Amino acid sequence: MLKGTFFCVDAHTCGNPVRLVTSGHPDLKGRTMSEKRQDFLAQYDWIRKALMFEPRGHDMMSGAFLYPPCSDNADAAILFIETSGCLPMCGHGTIGTITAALESGLLTPKMPGQLTIDVPAGQIKVQYQQTGAKVDWVKIFNVPAYLAHKDVVLDIPGLGPLKIDVSYGGNYYAIVDPQANFPGLRHWSAGDILRWSPIVREVAHRELNCVHPDDPTVNGVSHVLWTGDTISEGSNGANAVFYGDKAIDRSPCGTGTSARLAQLYSRGELKVGDEYTHESIIGSQFVGRIEAATKVGAFDAIMPSIKGWARITGHNAITVDDNDPYAFGFQVV
């Protein structure tokens, strides 16, 4: 029996894929996108798996559904999907979704050049520049970001002691700067990152309490951000973000950049008004900026922004037929 056909706009944000699903998204229960996210995970996670996992997706695939706004002041709402689940917030996903939606005529802003978007992590403001039919760039004013844990030494089996910070930028990140047991991003292979990241995340998740003060459904270390030397002109720092089971973000990562800004602000290395050009593992760049200081519960926090670009790569119609033994996807590792 046919389960559904999903029309999609495929794109990438600075090298990382975004699949905007334009039809077939379910009617979700809940007043907020946080509540709708929980309903999607409970009732419709087969859609995510079918569209993100092989054979219709791949290890790096991420995507989004565009929904009507939950708030009176918003233009739209976004539900993020990827191989690891439904993230509360996704920076590269927002940039790609907004670009694809505007260029495809799926989103009409109340005020050209500006958008207000409801996401599971809260509400974000967006600015963009469009020349003719093409969106040149998108700037996200993200949810508040803060440093949750500082200078925590974890014992990583097989690697040894590793000092990390944990910072929130829409998701919780274990941030690893160069040190004795990590010589820096450019001195490790992608295989090294894929090998050690799940172990670091598991230990950090087990030993550190990470629960968002305003939304307890947002909890636990989900990403690992490794830092190192830059390769692109104009970059202030470089990172490789691990997420899911075996994915390394090809973009500089929007929520990761937000988390990095919060970490550097907490350490006194950045101040309000500073920009920070953040580089990905492939050398693509986001421009992060600390817009303002704020609070998240008892934590000192920042209001970060991230500016980047995306390009549409194609359009497709994906059929999910439960007569197919791989209708709901698979993962090899």
Curated annotation (Swiss-Prot):
It is an enzyme of class 5 (isomerase). Substrate binds at G91, H92, H223, D249, G254, T255. Signal peptide: none annotated. Keywords: Isomerase. SUPFAM superfamilies: Diaminopimelate epimerase-like. The active site is at C90, C253. Its EC number is 5.1.1.8. It catalyses: trans-4-hydroxy-L-proline = cis-4-hydroxy-D-proline. One of its GO terms (molecular function) is 4-hydroxyproline epimerase activity. InterPro entries: Pro_racemase_fam (IPR008794). Catalyzes the epimerization of trans-4-hydroxy-L-proline (t4LHyp) to cis-4-hydroxy-D-proline (c4DHyp). Is likely involved in a degradation pathway that converts t4LHyp to alpha-ketoglutarate. Displays no proline racemase activity. Belongs to the proline racemase family. This is 4-hydroxyproline 2-epimerase. It comes from Shewanella loihica (strain ATCC BAA-1088 / PV-4).
